[in-house]
Amino acid sequence: VPTIFIENDVIAKSTTEQLDELAKNTVSLTEKFINDKLKANSNDVLRCNEIQIDCDWMASSKDRYFTFLKAIKKYSDKQISCTVRLYPYKFTKEMGVPPVDRAMLLCYNLLNPKNHSEKNTILDLEELKKYVQTDNNYPLPLDIGLPAYSSCYMFVNGKFDEVRHAVPENLEEITVEKTGKLWYTVERDTSFKYDYYKGGQQIKIERVSAKLLLDATKMIVDNVVLDETLLSEAAEKA
Protein backbone atom coordinates (compact mmCIF):
# COMPACT_ATOMS: atom_id res chain seq x y z
CA VAL A 1 0.00 0.00 0.00
CA PRO A 2 1.54 3.34 -0.99
CA THR A 3 1.88 5.43 2.17
CA ILE A 4 2.39 9.18 2.07
CA PHE A 5 3.85 10.89 5.14
CA ILE A 6 2.82 14.50 5.71
CA GLU A 7 4.20 16.75 8.45
CA ASN A 8 1.58 18.04 10.87
CA ASP A 9 2.96 21.58 10.45
CA VAL A 10 2.08 21.48 6.76
CA ILE A 11 -1.52 20.64 7.59
CA ALA A 12 -1.77 23.09 10.49
CA LYS A 13 -0.50 26.05 8.47
CA SER A 14 -2.51 25.45 5.27
CA THR A 15 -5.76 27.09 4.21
CA THR A 16 -8.75 25.09 3.00
CA GLU A 17 -7.84 25.95 -0.59
CA GLN A 18 -4.24 24.88 -0.07
CA LEU A 19 -5.33 21.61 1.53
CA ASP A 20 -7.55 20.87 -1.45
CA GLU A 21 -4.68 21.54 -3.85
CA LEU A 22 -2.34 19.42 -1.72
CA ALA A 23 -4.82 16.54 -1.78
CA LYS A 24 -5.24 16.81 -5.54
CA ASN A 25 -1.47 16.79 -6.10
CA THR A 26 -0.96 13.95 -3.61
CA VAL A 27 -3.43 11.71 -5.42
CA SER A 28 -2.06 12.65 -8.84
CA LEU A 29 1.58 11.98 -7.91
CA THR A 30 0.71 8.75 -6.11
CA GLU A 31 -1.20 7.46 -9.13
CA LYS A 32 1.78 8.38 -11.32
CA PHE A 33 4.12 6.53 -8.98
CA ILE A 34 1.92 3.44 -9.08
CA ASN A 35 1.71 3.50 -12.86
CA ASP A 36 5.40 4.27 -13.45
CA LYS A 37 7.18 2.29 -10.73
CA LEU A 38 5.07 -0.57 -9.43
CA LYS A 39 5.14 -2.82 -12.46
CA ALA A 40 4.56 -6.55 -12.30
CA ASN A 41 6.84 -8.94 -14.22
CA SER A 42 4.19 -9.17 -16.91
CA ASN A 43 4.40 -5.37 -17.29
CA ASP A 44 0.89 -5.03 -15.96
CA VAL A 45 0.38 -2.37 -13.34
CA LEU A 46 0.55 -3.91 -9.88
CA ARG A 47 -2.89 -3.91 -8.35
CA CYS A 48 -3.26 -1.18 -5.80
CA ASN A 49 -6.65 -0.57 -4.27
CA GLU A 50 -5.64 1.59 -1.34
CA ILE A 51 -3.74 4.78 -0.51
CA GLN A 52 -2.61 5.42 3.05
CA ILE A 53 -1.91 8.81 4.63
CA ASP A 54 0.50 9.04 7.56
CA CYS A 55 0.33 12.18 9.70
CA ASP A 56 0.81 12.73 13.44
CA TRP A 57 -2.07 15.15 13.73
CA MET A 58 -2.91 17.00 16.92
CA ALA A 59 -6.18 18.11 18.48
CA SER A 60 -5.46 21.65 17.26
CA SER A 61 -4.97 20.52 13.66
CA LYS A 62 -7.58 17.75 13.41
CA ASP A 63 -10.18 19.86 11.56
CA ARG A 64 -7.69 20.83 8.86
CA TYR A 65 -6.35 17.28 8.65
CA PHE A 66 -9.82 15.81 8.30
CA THR A 67 -10.59 18.38 5.59
CA PHE A 68 -7.49 17.18 3.77
CA LEU A 69 -8.55 13.52 4.08
CA LYS A 70 -12.00 14.31 2.70
CA ALA A 71 -10.34 15.98 -0.26
CA ILE A 72 -8.14 12.91 -0.80
CA LYS A 73 -11.29 10.78 -0.97
CA LYS A 74 -12.82 13.25 -3.41
CA TYR A 75 -9.92 12.98 -5.85
CA SER A 76 -9.20 9.25 -5.53
CA ASP A 77 -11.32 6.25 -6.47
CA LYS A 78 -9.27 4.01 -4.17
CA GLN A 79 -9.89 3.01 -0.58
CA ILE A 80 -8.33 5.61 1.72
CA SER A 81 -6.73 4.66 5.01
CA CYS A 82 -4.61 6.55 7.51
CA THR A 83 -2.30 5.79 10.39
CA VAL A 84 -3.53 6.25 13.95
CA ARG A 85 -1.21 6.39 16.93
CA LEU A 86 -2.22 5.04 20.31
CA TYR A 87 -3.12 8.39 21.87
CA PRO A 88 -5.79 9.34 19.29
CA TYR A 89 -6.96 5.71 19.33
CA LYS A 90 -7.78 5.95 23.03
CA PHE A 91 -8.86 9.59 23.22
CA THR A 92 -11.30 9.89 20.33
CA LYS A 93 -13.32 12.70 21.90
CA GLU A 94 -10.26 14.93 21.98
CA MET A 95 -8.57 13.79 18.78
CA GLY A 96 -11.56 12.90 16.60
CA VAL A 97 -11.97 10.02 14.16
CA PRO A 98 -10.48 10.46 10.68
CA PRO A 99 -12.97 10.38 7.77
CA VAL A 100 -11.36 7.39 6.04
CA ASP A 101 -12.31 3.82 5.14
CA ARG A 102 -9.98 2.11 7.60
CA ALA A 103 -7.04 2.85 9.90
CA MET A 104 -3.62 1.42 10.69
CA LEU A 105 -3.03 1.42 14.46
CA LEU A 106 0.68 2.04 15.08
CA CYS A 107 1.75 0.09 18.15
CA TYR A 108 5.33 1.31 18.46
CA ASN A 109 7.41 4.38 19.36
CA LEU A 110 5.50 4.49 22.62
CA LEU A 111 7.95 6.56 24.66
CA ASN A 112 10.40 9.41 24.21
CA PRO A 113 13.92 7.92 24.26
CA LYS A 114 15.28 11.11 25.80
CA ASN A 115 13.03 10.78 28.86
CA HIS A 116 12.79 7.04 29.49
CA SER A 117 16.36 5.87 29.86
CA GLU A 118 15.77 2.32 31.11
CA LYS A 119 12.81 1.31 28.94
CA ASN A 120 12.63 0.03 25.39
CA THR A 121 10.94 3.03 23.81
CA ILE A 122 10.18 1.18 20.56
CA LEU A 123 7.84 -1.29 22.24
CA ASP A 124 7.04 -1.52 25.95
CA LEU A 125 4.21 -3.80 27.09
CA GLU A 126 3.33 -1.78 30.17
CA GLU A 127 2.97 1.36 28.08
CA LEU A 128 1.05 -0.48 25.35
CA LYS A 129 -1.41 -1.79 27.93
CA LYS A 130 -2.30 1.76 29.01
CA TYR A 131 -3.74 2.45 25.57
CA VAL A 132 -5.22 -0.82 24.34
CA GLN A 133 -7.03 -1.67 27.57
CA THR A 134 -9.91 0.74 27.04
CA ASP A 135 -13.69 0.52 26.76
CA ASN A 136 -13.53 2.77 23.72
CA ASN A 137 -14.16 0.68 20.57
CA TYR A 138 -12.63 2.52 17.64
CA PRO A 139 -15.32 3.19 14.98
CA LEU A 140 -13.14 2.20 12.00
CA PRO A 141 -11.87 -1.16 10.72
CA LEU A 142 -8.33 -1.52 12.06
CA ASP A 143 -5.10 -2.98 10.80
CA ILE A 144 -2.15 -3.25 13.17
CA GLY A 145 1.38 -1.94 12.69
CA LEU A 146 4.14 -3.53 14.80
CA PRO A 147 7.86 -2.65 14.81
CA ALA A 148 10.38 -4.65 12.80
CA TYR A 149 13.40 -2.43 13.36
CA SER A 150 16.06 -1.54 15.90
CA SER A 151 17.57 1.72 17.11
CA CYS A 152 20.85 2.87 18.61
CA TYR A 153 20.69 6.12 20.57
CA MET A 154 23.99 7.97 20.85
CA PHE A 155 24.83 10.17 23.83
CA VAL A 156 27.77 12.55 24.32
CA ASN A 157 28.55 13.75 27.85
CA GLY A 158 25.15 12.49 28.95
CA LYS A 159 23.29 14.43 26.26
CA PHE A 160 21.40 12.92 23.33
CA ASP A 161 23.33 13.31 20.08
CA GLU A 162 21.73 11.18 17.35
CA VAL A 163 19.83 8.00 16.56
CA ARG A 164 20.80 5.27 14.11
CA HIS A 165 18.45 2.57 12.88
CA ALA A 166 19.02 -0.95 11.53
CA VAL A 167 21.45 -1.75 14.35
CA PRO A 168 23.99 -4.48 13.42
CA GLU A 169 23.34 -7.72 15.31
CA ASN A 170 26.84 -7.78 16.80
CA LEU A 171 27.20 -4.09 17.65
CA GLU A 172 27.81 -5.06 21.28
CA GLU A 173 31.23 -6.40 20.22
CA ILE A 174 32.68 -2.88 20.22
CA THR A 175 31.55 -2.15 23.78
CA VAL A 176 33.66 -2.67 26.87
CA GLU A 177 30.91 -3.02 29.42
CA LYS A 178 27.19 -3.05 29.87
CA THR A 179 26.23 -0.13 32.08
CA GLY A 180 22.47 -0.67 32.25
CA LYS A 181 19.66 -2.84 30.94
CA LEU A 182 20.03 -1.43 27.43
CA TRP A 183 23.13 0.73 27.87
CA TYR A 184 26.71 0.17 26.71
CA THR A 185 29.97 2.12 26.64
CA VAL A 186 32.09 2.11 23.48
CA GLU A 187 35.54 0.67 24.23
CA ARG A 188 37.61 2.75 21.78
CA ASP A 189 37.28 4.83 18.62
CA THR A 190 35.88 2.36 16.10
CA SER A 191 34.54 2.21 12.56
CA PHE A 192 31.91 -0.50 12.49
CA LYS A 193 29.58 -1.40 9.62
CA TYR A 194 30.22 1.96 7.90
CA ASP A 195 29.48 3.96 11.08
CA TYR A 196 31.91 5.66 13.47
CA TYR A 197 31.74 5.23 17.24
CA LYS A 198 33.85 7.28 19.64
CA GLY A 199 35.59 5.65 22.58
CA GLY A 200 33.87 6.34 25.88
CA GLN A 201 30.61 7.19 24.16
CA GLN A 202 27.42 5.88 25.75
CA ILE A 203 24.98 4.10 23.46
CA LYS A 204 21.53 2.67 24.12
CA ILE A 205 20.58 -0.28 21.92
CA GLU A 206 16.89 -1.07 21.49
CA ARG A 207 15.72 -4.18 19.67
CA VAL A 208 12.35 -5.93 19.46
CA SER A 209 12.56 -9.68 20.00
CA ALA A 210 10.21 -12.24 18.50
CA LYS A 211 8.85 -12.98 21.99
CA LEU A 212 8.13 -9.30 22.62
CA LEU A 213 6.28 -9.07 19.31
CA LEU A 214 4.23 -12.17 20.14
CA ASP A 215 3.37 -10.85 23.61
CA ALA A 216 2.34 -7.50 22.13
CA THR A 217 0.25 -9.23 19.47
CA LYS A 218 -1.59 -11.27 22.10
CA MET A 219 -2.29 -8.14 24.14
CA ILE A 220 -3.65 -6.35 21.07
CA VAL A 221 -5.83 -9.27 19.96
CA ASP A 222 -7.22 -9.60 23.49
CA ASN A 223 -8.13 -5.92 23.73
CA VAL A 224 -8.58 -4.35 20.29
CA VAL A 225 -11.59 -5.01 18.06
CA LEU A 226 -10.03 -6.06 14.77
CA ASP A 227 -11.39 -6.61 11.30
CA GLU A 228 -12.61 -10.24 10.98
CA THR A 229 -10.91 -10.47 7.59
CA LEU A 230 -7.58 -9.53 9.16
CA LEU A 231 -8.00 -12.12 11.90
CA SER A 232 -8.91 -14.83 9.39
CA GLU A 233 -5.83 -14.08 7.28
CA ALA A 234 -3.63 -14.14 10.39
CA ALA A 235 -5.07 -17.52 11.43
CA GLU A 236 -4.40 -18.97 7.98
CA LYS A 237 -0.75 -17.88 8.14
CA ALA A 238 -0.23 -19.16 11.69
Identify the function of each model-found stretch.
Residues 1-105:
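Chitinase-like catalytic core of GlcNAc-active glycosidases
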Residues 7, 17, 21, 31, ...:
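Glutamate identity and glutamate-enriched acidic tracts
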Residues 7-9, 20, 36, 44, ...:
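Acidic-enriched, low-complexity/disordered segments with a strong bias for Aspartate over Glutamate
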Residues 13, 116-123, 202-208, 224:
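Short, exposed beta-strand "edge-strand" segments with a Pro/Gly-rich flavor and a Y/T-containing core
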Residues 16-29, 67-70, 119-131, 213-236:
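Well-ordered, non-membrane alpha-helical segments in soluble/globular domains
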Residues 32-47, 75-76, 130-142, 227-237:
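A structural motif corresponding to the C-terminal end of an alpha-helix
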Residues 67-172:
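Substrate-binding surface in catalytic domains of secreted glycosidases
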Residues 154-232:
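Glycan-binding loop/region signatures in secreted carbohydrate-active enzymes
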